[in-house]
Amino acid sequence: MADMSGRYVIELPQAKKVAVAYSGGLDSALALKLLPDYYGVEEVLAVTCNVGLTEAELEEARSKAELCGVPWFLMDAEQEFVEDFITRAIYANSSYEGYPVATSMTRQLIARRVAEFALEQGCDAICEGSTGKGNDQYRMNNVFSMFAPDLKVIVPVREFNFTRQQEKELSAEYNLPYNPGIGDDRTMWCRSIGSGEVDNLQMRIAQEDYLWFRYPENAPDQPTDLEIEFQAGLPVRVSSEAEDVCGLAQVIHYLNRVGGENALGKIDMFEDGMIGLKSREVYEAPAAAILLALHRDLEQLCLTKEQIQFKPQVERQWSYMVYHGGWYHPVTMDCAAFCANSQWAVNGVYQVRLYKGTLDILGRQSSTGLFAPELRSLATAGWDQRESGPATKIHAMQYKILAKRGLKAE
């Protein structure tokens, strides 16, 4: 047992059987050791919910659990993430202050799956690796409270008030391997880049720290032309001269690679976190950047004026709730239902060009679009323009009333 004297002052919760939301990273791996040593836990279950980990990361998680003498359980949640989460994100043009709410979604999916597993296994507590300074602790706890309200929630890093350096030192005491490379959180929808250097506002992330994105100076000198098809609001196909890719997940993987190569998808922003403090966040999301830009444009073509005016309000509420840990909140469900119901007419095919960070729309077609140039254009007869005269008089009546009241604008 590592010497922890003086490292905590609160009374730690005690439990017998605990399911750990486990990625194999520093925080959750350390929990596997701390639970039996300081929380009285007799049985620890390490549960990895895969929403985008590589084979190497999965093997690292498995080997660390084995090193700790803890059984490891793997849940594949990528299909659910695509079908139930990314689809709603596209319908809602997901954006919280410019961030496509990827980690916000995955944490809540992971929390639900781990909570359900804990109940199935007869656990009396759930453990997760959040710090006390971030957003994930709120997201995870919200979901734990909804799906396993009677189970204790253990958060060792927060309860011991660890600094990152203390965690590294303690991992060394426990002989747990630690990869000192740049931290990240990756799904197919977005990858966040975590590093202490991000707090340095003069620092530019090195090219080698990106998975998909290339800086414009490293991007190809020739553009890449693509055709992307949407059906009922979702991208179903992307084609180039060399490839033809179908299916939402495959389209996203393809656009992450090709979009990133062409310098699309870097997000370097200031984010207002759940506790009200600003943080600098760096993300790469090439597929999300391309698809959301085209989806918004297609909605402008296919939705009514009133839908276009109202839907962004619903989208903002949806993104806010998801970011703040409310994926399963009733109002989030209501917003998602509205957005989904609006998508039946959002159909079209786009020809686009990717070039050194730009997304250029070359052409669009839609069988359900509301653009009617034969009516709007002055080059065609359309309707008798004289019919608009009486309509303008009716439309202006309120302004005549305002003038009589002496409320003219100065």
Segments (PLM) and residue ranges:
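Nucleotide-activated chemistry modules centered on ATP-dependent adenylation/adenylyltransferase
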Residues: 2-410
